[in-house]
């Protein structure tokens, strides 16, 4: 579905890396399954690539969220938004403003939590930035069968 490389949803500093440990009472309890970007309340959050908005909602931990299905099994999620600017079913473009940085859900302050899944697997969303823009169409092309050459052709 996408036709260009993925971009970061914000250009700000990353404050928490994918896979970093989460401590509770001095003990490692979980791993961080996304990337956190610094942001002031109300700053813009952009779609990482073209796609269809699969879900817009409000959840206890994640707060206001937008999920975008980019096709090919790739879905990105944007958590803790102060405001969502898209609706489920909308087609969004790469770089389109989809929401505003917030502090909704269980957070210590305003920021964007960016997450990604490939099929049923949670992946580091920063890895999407290195996917060639032609990956999806190249995978489809590899499945095509070439027609045999006519005999006697030189």
Regions found by a protein language model. Give the residues of each.
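Surface-exposed beta-loop interaction hotspot
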Residues: 1-2
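Catalytic cores of peptidoglycan-degrading enzymes
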Residues: 6-153
């Amino acid at each position: 579905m996408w036709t260009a490389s993925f971009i970061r949803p914000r250009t700000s500093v990353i404050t928490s890396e994918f896979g970093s440990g989460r401590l509770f009472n001095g003990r490692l309890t979980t791993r961080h399954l996304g990337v956190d970007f610094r942001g002031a309340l109300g700053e813009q959050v952009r779609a990482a690539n073209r796609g269809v908005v699969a879900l817009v909602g409000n959840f206890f931990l994640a707060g206001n969220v937008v999920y975008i299905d980019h096709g090919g099994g790739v879905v990105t999620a944007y958590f803790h938004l102060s405001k969502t600017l898209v609706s489920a079913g909308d087609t969004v473009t790469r770089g389109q403003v989809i929401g505003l940085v917030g502090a909704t859900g269980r957070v210590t302050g305003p920021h964007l939590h960016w997450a990604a899944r490939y099929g049923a697997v949670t992946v580091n969303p920063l890895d999407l930035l290195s996917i060639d823009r032609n990956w999806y169409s190249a995978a489809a092309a590899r499945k095509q069968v070439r027609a045999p050459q006519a005999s006697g052709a030189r």
